[in-house]
Regions:
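Extended two-metal-dependent nuclease catalytic cores across DNA- and RNA-processing enzymes
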Residues: 2-3, 22-26, 75-251
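Conserved RNase H-like, two-metal-ion catalytic cores of nucleic-acid enzymes
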Residues: 5-6, 10, 16-55, 71-72, ...
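Charged catalytic and DNA/RNA-contacting regions of genome-maintenance
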Residues: 129-131, 138-176, 320, 345-352, ...
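Conserved "right-hand" nucleotidyltransferase catalytic core of DNA-directed polymerases
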Residues: 231, 235-364, 379-383, 444-446, ...
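Function-dense linear segments that define catalytic or interfacial modules
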Residues: 348-352, 408-436, 445-450, 604-688
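Active-site palm subdomain of RNA-directed nucleic acid polymerases
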Residues: 462-474, 478, 798, 802-823, ...
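Conserved catalytic core of nucleic-acid polymerases
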Residues: 487, 599-600, 604-607, 682-815, ...
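C-terminal polymerase-core module
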Residues: 506-513, 517-569, 736-784, 788, ...
Length: 871
């Protein structure tokens, strides 16, 4: 049986993978889609081929012998995309970690290495499979050399296989003749000139008849069409050059020891570590290695028995830092102690070599342990956990002064990551790999160790990045404020919510009937395909080109049609009401607790700009634009004897823009409490202040807020339904009126490009990888974010400061009133009626003095018996 070798064209497959797999980045911001796609292709090939030997060849970024012959060789190629370029050294590191031989040589292309290696191996009696996305390699196909061309689309890979006979069947020429076809027709990808006027069909016919360009030249007067004959005579030297350029070397001067390419077990511990760092979780199942053989694990021990537990806590009380983890280890919870928490063990780390886990059994129930932990929280400098807010119910003695949340700290250092957990933090900040398949006890010990060991590491990094104060003075106190808000929740009138849903349902049924009547038939309004057929075929409305999936019925398409076609306006209303019913009327009902209140989760580690988000359910996206949407707020009510106080920052982002830009006119206007939108309209539209129309003021308002978000002329034209030219003039006049703003926004972009991040007044950083993208749309998006992130992020910081101060003051005065909701720039307080005036005074004072800016912060305040009235 013949031995088999697989030869992979490294750059070619990496390039294919890059464009075939959607963009991926790991938590460090490294693009990984090309590496991930490459590995998937390689594993597919290895699973199919099961080779004895494996080698990957790469191009070297340097001129080759072909460039010496023809300076413009590959001269038309665009530079490699930056996102792809940074992955080249990564894939080489991965391959070497897998003990896969990597070959590259200056002056030669990967194709020449493939040609030489395949030729040598065939001569040794081996079967060869060449994996390449470059069809030039088809010239290498023989009976024993197979060319495999992978195609990756949307992450799925298919492979075309070619032996010599397959090349002949597909292209009508032999692999060797394939070179001569290329010599005549040229190659735009490699900038091989070929013979002008000779395309693929003509070139193929000529070579089918004459086999080589040399033979064709000997019969040049017989060639057809006449133009090919004439041009081959005129460009004969160019044809010869093209053939040389297109010919892959079979005898390159390279050193190759076959034994170095032997393919045995690529799933090494080193490779496993790299896969973990690259966050290729789907590929880790291929490894049998023990990923968690870390030195730290030998210090893990389980503690049972009250005497031993008491000893552990006495030792822990003397420590400066303690890392703690709660584990839902259901297997260790006896029915007697299966309390509401669901936690089955607690783990502690109070020295690098003292990591214990305590199961909740007959000797140590959960309440006893949490009592010990709460007492411990008072005596240590740093009580550290991963996701501290989730456990504050069991730690009443813990404060923001000694509480430390490693997840929040890690988020500040990298706010672009989608998800944060102990394993990720350990890998990124401790260089510690934790196997996800571990038992709960071991995993809990690792989490406690991570919480302990990360404290000095994260504190140092926060200090180095100028965010230590942000963490200590804003983010950590906020953890406790958000916990209080979650515990408080907001009361919902269940019957009112039901009635609201019924009203929506009745109106939806009415709309369905009206839409069917106008369409002349019944159809599924929720089916884009059926809706497209009705609107664009039956009713013949103007539309974009039909695609494979049908006509687009997206909101932006229908919005343009609605003014002219009443049925479209009805469909848009139907969609809005259907969403209101499913998301709010029906959806909110599922979240009402036994106490009649909704306890939403407030998240501080999700948005890249630092804004707080709300989930389970999301109470921050309650509709405000349509009256039926706003009415949902009526179901949110204070408890008996209380009233809602809603306090909303007025134009906080514009005020921050005035402060940051130092624009004198805008600063003066805010100090004099002038109508900013009317003033902007007066300046932009060149009309006296007192003659500004309502429409002009509305348009100026859109410009004011659009500028904060780096709006383009196109975006503004869409918002205001005006021409792009008009929108560009509005923006131009705006910057003429407020020159300081233009200077500031330009500086935001240039600073972000130079530093790699945007920054708020409080030092919060938003990394800006988009600015380095080779994609124009991504770069443009990055520039808009660079303008907006300092403003939006500073607004987020200020509202957080206000929340902390308001909550602390309410508690300090022992008031019954509670802060229950935060929606961007708005705070909602459930105020005891007897404390109303005091609560309003606290809100006014703490919100308006949350930051000292060059312009005053202003708060709009309203009260009501429900959220609708208060808003």
């Amino acid at each position: 049986m013949r031995d088999k070798i697989v030869l992979i064209d490294g750059h070619s497959i990496l390039n294919r993978a890059f464009y075939g797999v959607p963009d991926l980045t790991n938590s460090e911001g490294l693009h990984t889609n090309a590496v991930y796609g490459f590995l998937n292709i390689m594993f597919k090939i290895l699973d199919e081929e099961r080779p004895d030997y494996l080698t990957v060849t790469f191009d070297v970024h340097a001129p080759t012998f072909r460039h010496e012959m023809f300076a413009d060789y590959k001269g038309t190629r665009k530079p490699m995309a930056e996102e792809l370029r940074q992955q080249v050294p990564v894939i080489k590191d991965v391959l070497r970690a897998m003990h896969i031989e990597v070959i590259e040589k200056a002056g030669l292309e990967a194709d020449d290495l493939l040609g030489t290696l395949s030729h040598r191996c065939e001569e040794k009696g081996m079967d060869v499979s060449i994996i390449s996305g470059d069809r030039d390699t088809l010239q290498l196909a023989t009976e024993h050399i197979k060319i495999r061309i992978p195609k990756t689309k949307q992450g799925k890979t298919e492979v075309e296989d070619y032996y010599a006979a397959d090349v002949q069947e597909r292209y009508g020429v032999t692999p060797k003749e394939f070179i001569d076809v290329k010599a005549l027709m040229g190659d735009t990808a490699d900038n091989i000139p070929g013979v002008p006027g000779v395309g693929e069909k003509t070139a193929t016919k000529i070579i089918q008849q004459y086999q080589t360009i040399e033979n064709a030249y000997e019969h040049v007067d017989e060639l057809k069409p006449p133009r090919a004959s004439k041009n081959l005579k005129e460009f004969w030297e160019q044809a010869q050059l093209s053939k040389t350029l297109a010919t892959i070397k079979l005898d390159a001067d390279i050193t190759f020891e076959l034994e170095n390419a032997r393919h045995e077990n690529p799933y090494t511990k080193e490779a496993h570590e790299l896969f973990q760092r690259l966050e290729f979780k789907n590929l880790l199942g291929r490894f049998d290695v023990e990923a968690s053989v870390n030195d730290v694990e030998k210090y893990f021990r389980e503690v049972t028995g009250k005497e031993e537990i008491e000893k552990v806590f006495k030792e822990a009380e003397k420590a400066e830092t303690v890392g703690v983890a709660f584990s839902k280890d259901a297997g260790n919870v006896l029915p007697l102690f299966a309390h509401a928490s669901g936690y089955g063990r607690v783990s502690l780390c109070y020295e690098a070599e003292k990591i214990v886990t305590i199961p909740c059994d007959m000797d140590a129930d959960f309440e006893y342990l949490t009592g010990k932990l709460s007492h411990l929280a008072k005596s240590v400098k740093r009580f550290s956990m991963c996701g501290l807010k989730e456990y504050l119910e069991w730690l009443p003695e813990l404060t923001s002064e000694n509480g430390f949340d490693v997840i929040v700290a890690a988020y500040l250092l990298n706010p672009l990551k989608n998800d944060y957990n102990a394993e990720d933090v350990a890998r990124e900040h401790l260089n510690l790999l934790i196997d996800e398949k571990l038992d709960e006890g071991t995993k809990s010990c690792y989490e406690a160790y991570t919480a302990y060991a990360c404290v000095p590491v994260l504190e140092k990094k926060l200090e180095e990045n100028g965010m230590f104060r942000l963490f200590n003075e804003i983010e950590m106190p906020l953890v406790f404020t958000l916990y209080d808000m979650e515990q408080a929740g907001v009361k919902v009138e269940g019957e009112e919510l039901k009635r609201y849903g019924e009203e929506l349902g009745a109106r939806i049924v009415e709309l369905e009937k009206e839409i069917y009547e106008m369409a002349g038939e019944e159809f599924n309004i929720n089916s884009p395909k059926q809706l497209g057929m009705i609107l664009f075929e039956k009713l013949e409305m103007p539309h974009a080109k039909k695609t494979k999936t049908g006509y687009s019925t997206a909101a932006d398409v229908l919005d343009k049609l609605a003014p002219e076609y009443p049925i479209v306006a009805k469909i848009l209303e139907y969609r809005q009401l259907a969403k209101l019913k499913s998301t709010y009327a029906d959806g909110l009902a599922n979240y009402i607790g036994m106490d009649g209140r909704i306890h939403s989760k407030f998240n501080q580690t999700i948005t890249a700009t630092g804004r707080i988000s709300s989930t389970e359910p999301n109470l921050q996206n309650i509709p405000v634009r349509m009256e039926l949407g706003r009415l949902i707020r009526k179901v949110f009510v204070p408890k008996e004897g209380c009233v809602f106080v809603d306090a909303d920052y007025s134009q906080i982002e514009l005020r921050i823009l005035a402060h940051c830009s130092g624009d004198e006119q805008l600063i003066q206007a805010y100090r004099e409490a002038r109508d900013i939108h009317r003033m902007t309209a007066s300046q932009v539209f060149h009309v006296p202040f007192n003659e500004v129309t309502d429409l002009q003021r509305r348009n100026a308002k859109a410009v004011n807020f659009g500028i904060v978000y780096g709006i383009s002329s196109f975006g503004l034209s869409q918002d205001l339904s005006i021409s792009r030219k008009e929108a560009a003039q509005y923006i131009e006049h705006y910057f003429e009126s407020y020159p300081g703003i233009k200077t500031f926004l330009d500086k935001c972009v240039s600073d972000a490009k130079e530093k790699g991040y945007a920054e708020t007044l409080y030092g919060r950083r938003r990394p800006m990888p988009e600015l380095k993208s080779s994609n124009f749309m991504q770069r443009s998006f990055g520039e808009r974010v660079a303008m907006n992130a300092p403003i939006q992020g500073t607004a987020a910081d200020i509202i957080k400061i206000a929340m902390i101060h308001v909550n602390e003051e309410l508690k300090k005065r022992n008031l019954k009133s509670r802060m229950i909701l935060q929606v961007h720039d708005e705070l909602l307080i459930e105020a005891d009626e007897r404390e109303l005036e005091e609560v309003q005074q606290i809100l006014q004072d703490k919100m308006e003095h949350a930051a000292e800016l060059l312009v005053p912060l202003s708060v709009d305040m309203h009260t009501g018996k429900n959220w609708y009235e208060a808003k």
